[in-house]
Amino acid sequence: MKFSVGPLAVALVTMSGIAVFPAIGSAEPDTPTPTPASETNSRTAILPVFAQEGIRVRTGKPGELLTIHLPEDVPLAPAQWRPDGDATYRAADTEYTVTPLIDGGEYFTIVKKNPGESFDYKVRLGLPAGTHWVRHGTTLLIESDGAPDNPSLLVGMFASPKVTTGKGADIPLTVEIDSDATVTLSARSPELANTPVEIGFSYHPVDATT
């Protein structure tokens, strides 16, 4: 799945798929799915054995990778691999699973087994040189830096995250990002208590053309 987006594009990203305004570009409407086992060797993401090294994914700028650092408040065990290419990093009561997608992106799943009535996770982004982030609600766009003769282009995007409890309830999520590109995912609700909670979000590279 590839996207060709003009410099004035505003992408709308939801957990059910990706849509780009028809006047600017188009994308397949289907939801991104995990990469089949036969294709995992060709994925472009780099999933390290140790999570603290950062998960590196491609952007629409050739050769430029975005680094995604999982929360570092507690040590994570080395990656456990599945045949389909998933990597899971575990802490005492939390699991982080990274699943390769067919468009070269990754789907991130955070499972907290015994949460209280709130949680707070910080995901740090290492942006490649010559790029910056732009927020649209709970969607985060990665764009190239613009210049008078070189307009800014969309080169990657994070879909809006979603929180679901083990009882099937959807919980409102607060998303904040600071000047250092640290994204904080937090929620507070009595429905979070005494039930497993799953937070899911995805990253997608965008092959932009002028």
What is the meaning of each model-derived region?
Residues 1-28:
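Secretory targeting and sorting signals
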Residues 27-210:
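Residues that cap or anchor secondary-structure elements
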